[in-house]
Amino acid sequence: MAIKLLNDNVINKIAAGEVIERPASVVKELLENAIDAASRNIAVKISGAGLDSIEVTDDGEGISMEELPLAFLRHATSKIENEGDLLRIMSMGFRGEALPSIASVSRIDIYSKKEKQEGIHCFIEGGKILDLQYFPGPEGSKIIVSDLFFNTPARKKFLRSPVTEGNNAYELVIKYALARPDIAISFSNEKRQLFRTPGNGSLNDAVIAIFGRDFLEPLIPVKWEGLSLSISGLISPPGVAKMNRKRQLIFVNQRPIRSPLLYRALDEGYRGLLLAREQPLVILQIAVPPDSIDVNVHPQKSEIRFRDEQSIFRSLCGLLRDTLNARDYRLQDNLPQNRSQPFYPAAGRKTAKQKVEEQPVIPFMHNRKADKRVEETGGEPWIPFYPEEQAEGSVSRVYDEFKILGQLWDSYILLEKEQTLNIVDQHAAHERIIYSRLQQFYAASRGEMQMLAFPLLMDLSLRDMELLEKNQEILGELGFDLQQAGPRSIFLRGTPAIIAGQEREVLFEILELLAGGQGINLKNEAIIKMACKKAVKAGTRLDYREMMQIIQELFITDDYKNCPHGRPTIIAWKQADLERMFKR
């Protein structure tokens, strides 16, 4: 086949494949253009997850009648003029690819007006300008993108669900709203505004506008300035963490970025203060000279390279350690030490205490008769889930004789049974036990609710309020009693008994599940969240009786070999396996 020069329409569609992957990509490019136009107010609205329409309105500089046709030509831009400008980029965009790429796969209406000039309207379909005329309007621009991917239907097959695509756009606008707290940025989905930042330059006020005051309250302000580097923002104390990096928002020269280097710095700064897989919450602004970074790495400009990576790494690590060392945050501080909360969820029975004498560190033989010596007390909550008469019959299914050899690294229970060495992950095992019991509870009836003596007042985001309103029934089934207190606040009056002391944290976790549109698995995912939060954590020292209780309950639990997330609870080596390793 002969080599041919592709026409502009095909070239633009190829470029669109790199730049415009999904509706959120369109939102990103239009939002960056609005920021570069020196806008003070930007409104983003989407409909149909962004496939039906995406509208971005700003009060920026606008586009003139003469410039507008150029705006839809590839590599036409007002951001740079020569090669040297690439070394000191401060604008969000600079490639001149966004508008032609968007136009090639959608229908676009543009309304724009520059100061002291007439307003204009332009209609573009599939990359072709079909109408261009003067049109009265306010200064600034309004761009409406409709029928995204109408001429590339195969692209739609690779998109996620409407809920997921809508959330992608929502999360993206959040990043820019926090990167630029000096600009009032709002986001609306299906004509309902989910947030609007005040644009007064205060990061705290922007966080409150987006997430609510309860999100901001535990965060710690940080600030550090060097000769050619400054870092400022908010970080979470070790006791406040998530299981992913979703709320690690990092901006370099006010540009949202992803950086493995900075993620490693966060991991190092929090090393020894978080449990395995936990991630801190951070909102950080890093300012460096524009010629010390390279943003021309990826078409989406989401990755950058630092000229002096070691300096950035050391500075961020040092700031985190100095801030967190101001108080003696130890890992043990973040683990549940209050034994006034049950080790297992108890169903309507008195608290019981098993009298077990102090056990030696060296192996000891399990003796169920000794464990059955019980006395009534009023304070020790580490009780079996089952009532005692039920537990006795169930435990007969457990190993008749085994040795608990001890605890390894305050995280694993070592167990010997029938010439087999078993290593039990205490968190995964306890999580499986609690999950199975909660499933039984919720299968039999509505969740066991504990009414709070003093209702908790929670300040939430508008999106969270919308999610609560739409999911009242399933939250009630889980055991939550909520009452609206204001446009953005609720009274939490009752919660599932199992999450006592962790009400706020668990509700926020469930709100994330609701936002993700888990559908028919939502209830099960919420139960997993509650079990995970309640389960004893890695790094928690257990006494003999507590280890014994986990082992007894684990082996009478269905599917005991894996936790609800699918990770193994127990790993076993037979004596023959060990002898083979030692070449005996």
From Swiss-Prot:
One annotated GO molecular function: ATP binding
Keyword DNA repair: yes
Coiled-coil stretches: none
UniProt keywords, alphabetically: DNA damage, DNA repair
InterPro entries xrefs: DNA_mismatch_repair_CS, DNA_mismatch_repair_MutL, DNA_mismatch_S5_2-like, HATPase_C_sf, MutL/Mlh/PMS, MutL/Mlh/Pms-like, MutL_C, MutL_C_dimsub
Keyword field contains Repressor: no
Pfam families reported for this sequence: DNA_mis_repair, HATPase_c_3, MutL_C
GO cellular component labels: mismatch repair complex
SUPFAM superfamilies per UniProt: ATPase domain of HSP90 chaperone/DNA topoisomerase II/histidine kinase, DNA mismatch repair protein MutL, Ribosomal protein S5 domain 2-like
Protein task: This protein is involved in the repair of mismatches in DNA. It is required for dam-dependent methyl-directed DNA mismatch repair. May act as a 'molecular matchmaker', a protein that promotes the formation of a stable complex between two or more DNA-binding proteins in an ATP-dependent manner without itself being part of a final effector complex.
Protein name: DNA mismatch repair protein MutL
Gene name of the record: mutL
